[in-house]
């Protein structure tokens, strides 16, 4: 759980630092940042359209920003590196801020959206998308989209290749969210392919002779490995067969129980035979007594 909380705190701190730079460097054309923890301190790379305004006269502004980072976000010795954005129209964050400012100045949203996305495509972008959400016109909020070219919405390319930028336009009716996505000109997409018209077929087709030689080498290597394995198996000492002639046979518990049951049955059988023999003797004695009584009665009658 501690690791999860640490990741959440790091993400929250990153978002807060990004918002801080967006507010402080709005006039300088803030184009995003990158954080990299190092043993010497936190390394921060700032991208701006006007690096001179970020640094300030004699480095006054950059020292002020460094002090605020240490006090507000508890960063130890932050090292700030300011880089100039070569093509502002291909930086999604700068484009989003520009579009938000145009909406605040009263530009109609369709004109602002089409003009902005046309400038992006003219700069060489492979694709772009602008999404305006909020009270664009009227009292009801809605979403307006402007698309050009090719854009990725999910998967690893959407995270690694597509440049994202967000801005907010504060209007009289309410706020309008601005979301910009741009695919730069030199992006390598996973589904790209190239057709070579003047390609030499011999360079692309595998030579059968070379393929056969490679296959023979592979088979020879497998045969050599098999021979080595057989040699190792032959070199191992043979285990002596176990001699069970002199060993005593140990009866299991089940065998002992079976013998005990047989003995018990035999004893019960003997007891039953004794009981039946006693009954036979008693019956014989009783029969003899009856015969004697009958003889006595016959004698008395005569």
UniProtKB/Swiss-Prot annotation:
Gene3D superfamilies: 3.30.300.20, Ribosomal protein S3, C-terminal domain (3.30.1140.32). It comes from Halobacterium salinarum (strain ATCC 700922 / JCM 11081 / NRC-1). PANTHER family: 30S/40S RIBOSOMAL PROTEIN S3, SMALL RIBOSOMAL SUBUNIT PROTEIN US3. It comes from the Archaea. HAMAP family: Ribosomal_uS3_A. Residues 17-86 form the KH type-2 domain. Part of the 30S ribosomal subunit. This is Small ribosomal subunit protein uS3. Belongs to the universal ribosomal protein uS3 family. Residues 222-302 are annotated as: Disordered. Binds the lower part of the 30S subunit head. SUPFAM superfamilies: Prokaryotic type KH domain (KH-domain type II) (SSF54814), Ribosomal protein S3 C-terminal domain (SSF54821). One of its GO terms (cellular component) is cytosolic small ribosomal subunit.
